[in-house]
Amino acid sequence: MAGQLREYRRRIRSVQSTKKITRAMELIAASRIAKARARVAAARPYAEEITRVIEAVAAQTTIDHPLTTERPGAARAAVVVITSDRGLAGGYSSNALRRTGELIELLHSEGKETDLHVVGRKGTGYYRFRGRAMSGEYTGFSEQPSYADAKSVADALIAAFIATSENGGVDEIHVVHTEYVSAITQTPVARRLLPMVLTETDEPPRGGPLPQYEFEPSAEGVLDALLPRYVESRLYAALLESAASESAARQRAMKSATDNAEDLIKRYTRQANRARQDAITQEISEIVGGANALASGT
């Protein structure tokens, strides 16, 4: 009985130690959510406005530019997937990887080969374990990405986009990231980054009528200058939104782990109390039995 009681107490101490860690990680993740959401809100206006500028330029010119023009017979697509560098974030990375798998299957069904560019150690480890070649690996900044991080990814993508097919160029760029909906809901989404998807509609553009521009030196020159800015800003917005989603997923996972630890502590405490009561009952029985034996002997 005494050995069983010691074992329960050892387990309680072990779970209490784990609970302190998960609780601390929960609080850290919760504090990062607000900061990440503020960064998303700050970056969104620039990304949306540069998209409006490109739409305005495309609407006022008839030139065929790689930024806005579909390539006939597109045969190769780059796919960027954003995952986490660390674990303990629930299904955050696995959901993004699953969505990437669906996108790759769709592209393959259209007869397109895919080049993978993976952000986050979870993603690189996943594909390396499966022997999948990656054209780009970017790690170390999933929780707090900077614009320089987005630019490093964008530079590789733009170089592939403007390269010829003989030199390993791609015809399309897709990005898979996790969209922050709320503290409870984060949804993995796949969007085509290049060429831009321009839809013709009779409805007025969001944000008001598109501005009228005069182009110097030319509309094509403006689009050439906007190409890297557009890719960088869109990737930066995706990285920031994914960072907010990662923190929310980790906060929720750590809260669940903390709650489970509390339930486990309560269960072990009840079992320890029961073992202690059994030990006391046994001791009393032995004392009473000994007393009765002495009494009967006299």
Curated annotation (Swiss-Prot):
Domain of life: Bacteria
Membrane topology: Peripheral membrane protein
Gene Ontology cellular component annotations, sorted alphabetically: plasma membrane; proton-transporting ATP synthase complex
Alphabetical keyword list: ATP synthesis, Cell membrane, CF(1), Hydrogen ion transport, Ion transport, Membrane, Transport
Gene3D superfamilies the record matches: 3.40.1380.10, ATP synthase, gamma subunit, helix hairpin domain
Role played: Produces ATP from ADP in the presence of a proton gradient across the membrane. The gamma chain is believed to be important in regulating ATPase activity and the flow of protons through the CF(0) complex.
Record HAMAP family: ATP_synth_gamma_bact
UniProt family annotation: Belongs to the ATPase gamma chain family.
Name the record gives this protein: ATP synthase gamma chain
